UniProtKB/Swiss-Prot annotation:
The lineage of its organism: Bacteria, Pseudomonadati, Pseudomonadota, Gammaproteobacteria, Enterobacterales. Residues 1-20 form the signal peptide. GO terms for cellular component: plasma membrane. This is Beta-lactamase OXA-7. This is an oxacillin-hydrolyzing beta-lactamase.
Length: 266
C-alpha cells in the first residue's frame, strides 16, 4: 500500500501554486468508490514545509458553497468587529421555532459552532454588514469573496464559493494565527472548533448545503486539522450529496483515509 508519505511534495502557499503542486493519491479513491460517492479529500502535512496530497486534482481546486464551514470566518469576523463581544457571550433564543430543536436554546459561541446554529450566525452576519464582511473576506483571501445573494445567506445559497485547497490554506493560516485578525480572536475560534480530544486533537467544522438532486447535487463538507504529537495535518473533504442518508459519509470517508495513514484511530 502506498501511504500519504509516498505521495506528498513541497507546496507553495498561494492558492494557484498549491493547487498545481499537490500530488494525486489515487489509492484513496477506493473509499469513495466503496460508497459510490463523488468527492475530494485534500490532506496536508505541516512539518518544516507544507506537503499535500489529494485523490482528485481537478476537484481539489473546484469551488463550492462553503455552507456551515463558513461559520469559522464568520465567527472571527464577528469578534473582530465587536458584534461578538467575547467567547463568553450568550446568544439568546427568541423563543420562536427553529429548524432544529438543538438550536432552540441560549447558546455560547462554542455551543453555536458545535451545533451549527444557522440563525445565530445569520444574525452575526446581519450585524457585521456587507461592507465589513466584504473587507474581511478579502483580507482572508477566502474563496471567491462573492457575498451576493443576501448578507445572511450568501454562504448557504448565494454566490460565495471556496475550494478544498483554499479551505486548507485558510485553516493553516488560522492555526498559525496568521489571518488578518487579532491572535486572541483566532485562538477563541480555534478552541471552539475542538470536536475530539483523545490522543490527538481535532479542530473541525462540517457543512451541508442541502441534498439537491442527482443531476444537481448539494455539497457536504468536513474541514479542519489534526494535532498529533509534533505534527499537524490539515484536511478538507467535500462530496456531492443527493440523499441525506449519505450525510455521515462526509466524516466517515476522510476518517478512514486518515486512519489508513496512521494519523487518527488505531
Amino acid at each position: 500500500m502506498k501511504t500519504f508519505a509516498a505521495y506528498v511534495i513541497t507546496a507553495c502557499l498561494s492558492s494557484t501554486a498549491l493547487a498545481s503542486s499537490i500530488t494525486e493519491n489515487t489509492f484513496w479513491n477506493k473509499e469513495f468508490s466503496a460508497e459510490a460517492v463523488n468527492g475530494v479529500f485534500v490532506l496536508c502535512k505541516s512539518s518544516s514545509k507544507l506537503a499535500c496530497a489529494t485523490n482528485n486534482l481537478a476537484r481539489a481546486s473546484k469551488e463550492y458553497l462553503p455552507a456551515s464551514t463558513f461559520k469559522i470566518p464568520n465567527a472571527i469576523i464577528g469578534l473582530e468587529t465587536g458584534v461578538i463581544k467575547n467567547e463568553h457571550q450568550i446568544f439568546k433564543w427568541d423563543g420562536k421555532p427553529r429548524a432544529m430543536k438543538q438550536w432552540e436554546r441560549d447558546l455560547s459561541l462554542r455551543g453555536a459552532i458545535q451545533v451549527s446554529a444557522v440563525p445565530v450566525f445569520q444574525q452575526i452576519a446581519r450585524e457585521v454588514g456587507e461592507v465589513r464582511m466584504q473587507k474581511y473576506l478579502k483580507k482572508f483571501s477566502y474563496g471567491n469573496q462573492n457575498i451576493s445573494g443576501g448578507i445572511d445567506k450568501f454562504w448557504l445559497e448565494g454566490q460565495l464559493r471556496i475550494s478544498a485547497v483554499n479551505q486548507v490554506e485558510f485553516l493553516e493560516s488560522l492555526f498559525l494565527n496568521k489571518l488578518s485578525a487579532s491572535k486572541e480572536n483566532q485562538l477563541i475560534v480555534k478552541e471552539a472548533l475542538v470536536t475530539e480530544a483523545p490522543e490527538y486533537l481535532v479542530h473541525s467544522k462540517t457543512g451541508f448545503s442541502g441534498v439537491g438532486t442527482e443531476s444537481n447535487p448539494g455539497v457536504a463538507w468536513w474541514v479542519g486539522w489534526v494535532e498529533k504529537g509534533a505534527e499537524v495535518y490539515f484536511f478538507a473533504f467535500n462530496m456531492d450529496i443527493d440523499n441525506e442518508n449519505k450525510l455521515p459519509l462526509r466524516k466517515s470517508i476522510p476518517t478512514k483515509i486518515m486512519a489508513s495513514e496512521g494519523i487518527i484511530g488505531g
